[in-house]
From Swiss-Prot:
A single MF term (Gene Ontology): nucleotidyltransferase activity
Purpose: Toxic component of a type II toxin-antitoxin (TA) system. Expression in E.coli inhibits cell growth; bacteriostasis is neutralized by expression of cognate antitoxin Xre. Expression in E.coli leads to almost complete depletion of intracellular NAD(+): NAD(+) levels are partially restored when coexpressed with antitoxin Xre.
UniProt record similarity statement: Belongs to the MbcT/ParT/Res family.
Outcome recorded upon mutating residue 115 to A: No longer toxic in E.coli
Pfam families given in the database record: RES
Known partners and oligomeric status: Homodimer. Forms a complex with cognate antitoxin Xre.
Protein name: Toxin Res
Keywords from the named record: NAD, Nucleotidyltransferase, Toxin-antitoxin system, Transferase
Superkingdom of origin organism: Bacteria
Keyword Amino-acid biosynthesis annotated: no
EC number(s) from the headed UniProt entry: 2.4.2.-
Keyword Mitochondrion part of the UniProt annotation: no
Length: 156
């Protein structure tokens, strides 16, 4: 499964470490645990960044990264078990607990979760501490990438 990550170019070297997620947490895990959030399409990767960007200045110098993780290394979250507020603008502790529990019990590298922005599309949470994660770093490809500034203007 080819997965995509859009990151500031200055963070490319640490893009697969999970350090940012460890420091700040995320919708699907608690602070203190390394995690790497990726999307199943380039357009979703862009939207996942764009939702947090409010300034044309921030749209420069991005890198698009891809990684190839075998599907047998990826679990799928049963969305029918999610609470009604799973996609609230401010992540609920319930989704953080769901993801954190997966990190504790799973031996897989990734967990497919729905996007809170486009619920019919998926993100994947990668566990950089998983036993075999390092084997797939050599599949990473980089392409410099710019986001069309009209997308931010449309948000205003």
């Amino acid at each position: 499964m080819i997965l995509y990550r859009l990151t500031r170019s200055k963070y490319v070297e640490s893009a697969w470490s999970g350090t940012g997620a460890k420091l700040y947490g995320g919708r699907w895990h608690n602070i203190g645990r390394p995690a790497v959030y990726v999307a199943t399409s380039v357009s979703l990767a862009v939207l996942e960044v764009l939702v947090h960007v409010g300034d044309d200045e921030l749209l420069t110098d991005f890198a698009l990264l891809s990684i190839d993780i075998p599907e047998n290394q990826i679990d799928i979250l049963d969305i029918d078990t999610l609470p009604s507020d799973w996609n609230a603008p401010v992540p609920s502790t319930c989704t953080m607990e769901i993801g954190s529990e997966w990190f504790e019990v799973s031996h897989s590298i990734g967990l497919v979760v729905p996007s809170a922005i486009v619920p019919y599309e998926n993100n994947v949470i990668l566990n950089p501490m998983a036993k075999d994660f390092h084997k797939y770093i050599n599949t990473v490809k980089r392409l410099d990438f710019g986001i069309d500034s009209r997308l931010v203007k449309a948000k205003k």
